[in-house]
UniProtKB/Swiss-Prot annotation:
Transmembrane residue ranges: 1-21, 67-87, 95-115, 143-163
Compartments in which it is found: Golgi apparatus membrane; Cell membrane; Apical cell membrane; Membrane raft
Entry similarity comment: Belongs to the PMP-22/EMP/MP20 family.
Gene3D superfamilies: 1.20.140.150
Residues linked to a glycan: 44, 47, 52
Cited function: Functions as a key regulator of cell membrane composition by regulating protein surface expression. Also, plays a role in regulation of processes including cell migration, cell proliferation, cell contraction and cell adhesion. Regulates transepithelial migration of neutrophils into the alveolar lumen, potentially via mediation of cell surface expression of adhesion markers and lipid raft formation. Negatively regulates caveolae formation by reducing CAV1 expression and CAV1 amount by increasing lysosomal degradation.
Main location: Golgi
This protein's name: Epithelial membrane protein 2
UniProt-listed PANTHER family: EPITHELIAL MEMBRANE PROTEIN 2 (PTHR10671:SF32), EPITHELIAL MEMBRANE PROTEIN-RELATED (PTHR10671)
GO-annotated cellular components: apical part of cell; apical plasma membrane; cell surface; cytoplasm; Golgi apparatus; Golgi membrane; membrane raft; nucleus
Subunit: Interacts with PTK2; regulates PTK2 activation and localization. Interacts with ITGB3; regulates the levels of the heterodimer ITGA5-ITGB3 integrin surface expression. Interacts with P2RX7 (via C-terminus). Interacts with ITGB1; the interaction may be direct or indirect and ITGB1 has a heterodimer form.
Organism: Bos taurus
Keywords recorded for this protein, A-Z: Cell membrane, Cytoplasm, Glycoprotein, Golgi apparatus, Membrane, Nucleus, Transmembrane, Transmembrane helix
Its membrane topology: Multi-pass membrane protein
């Protein structure tokens, strides 16, 4: 039982770490001479421009930013609630509240990654002056980490739903 508990805790912390890196790091769209994410666009590693309301379709970028931040916060809250429930639940009860919050984090990261997947090309085309040198890029590791975090949070949310408290 102790090994299972340790695995669940490590799995959850890994999910939170993946979400943090995917949200913070500047590598959602990368190329040889540039990298761009949901916060800024950098060309030649020196010329960085923050994304602000002057960017067309900034509301789309803000939706991705907000849902990634929300997913990270929800994942951390789910972990704290899990620890609280670990000591408060009666024997045999399920970690339903933790599961619901973790699945909400999963939903948020899925929404963010899906919006970015769908709208990235439109944002780049509508803001040619900002994204002029980013046409030859590909999805970066932060984008991939967001999808991996989606899978991790989904699995952990299901794990919490199935899990019952034992002695």
């Amino acid at each position: 039982m102790l090994v299972l508990l340790a695995f669940i805790i490590v799995f959850h912390i890994t999910s939170a770490a993946l979400l943090l890196v995917a949200t913070i790091d500047n590598a959602w769209w990368v190329g040889e001479e540039f990298f761009a994410d949901i916060w800024k666009v950098c060309v030649n590693n020196t010329n960085c421009t923050e994304l602000n309301d002057s960017v067309q379709d900034f509301s789309t970028v803000q939706a991705v930013q907000a849902t990634m931040i929300l997913s990270t916060i929800l994942c951390c809250i789910a972990f704290l609630i899990f620890l609280l429930q670990l000591f408060r639940l009666k024997q045999g009860e399920r970690f339903v509240l933790t599961s619901i919050i973790q699945l909400m984090a999963c939903l948020c990261v899925m929404i963010a990654a899906s919006i970015y997947t769908d709208r990235r090309k439109d944002i780049h085309e509508k803001n040619e002056e900002l994204y002029a040198q980013t046409s030859g890029g590909s999805f970066g590791y932060s984008f991939i980490l967001a999808w991996v975090a989606f899978a991790f949070t989904f699995i952990s949310g299901l794990m919490y739903l199935i899990l019952r408290k034992r002695k």
